[in-house]
Regions:
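C-terminal regions of RecA-like/P-loop NTPase motor modules
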Residues: 2, 6-20, 31-115
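H-loop/switch region of ABC-family ATPase nucleotide-binding domains
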Residues: 27
């Protein structure tokens, strides 16, 4: 449950501060966040991980945008602006991602989602 995540989140933040390093933590989203729209989930959709959203300096969520693209949302940025969306293309043959524009992502969606 969420109470078990709070001390973990706090410890991750303490380690990051004391070692002056960045830590990447992955969290599952709840069912409400896994909706049918194309937009990525929001911070409130972090499943049992409210503390991660509160303790984090940056929260980026992602969602599949068709078969070959991903859409990301900068949901929280403690040191700057947030709310930006950005897109990437996925290359399944080597597992790499490449940043692309929304127009390019839309074209990929049209091309590969018909297969």
């Amino acid at each position: 449950d969420w109470r078990s995540m709070a001390p973990i989140s706090k410890h991750l933040k303490e380690v990051a501060i004391s070692t002056n390093t960045r830590i990447l933590a992955a969290a599952q989203i709840n069912r409400e966040g896994d909706n049918a729209t194309w937009r990525p989930p929001q911070t409130k959709h972090l499943s049992q991980s409210d503390a991660l959203g509160q303790d984090a300096d940056v929260v980026i969520t992602q969602k599949q945008y068709g078969q070959r693209a991903m859409v990301y949302s900068l949901e929280k940025n403690r040191h700057g602006s947030s709310g930006q969306l950005f897109f990437s293309r996925f290359f399944p043959n080597n597992g790499q991602f490449e940043e692309i524009t929304k127009d390019e992502a839309d074209l990929l969606r049209e091309r590969y989602d018909d297969e």
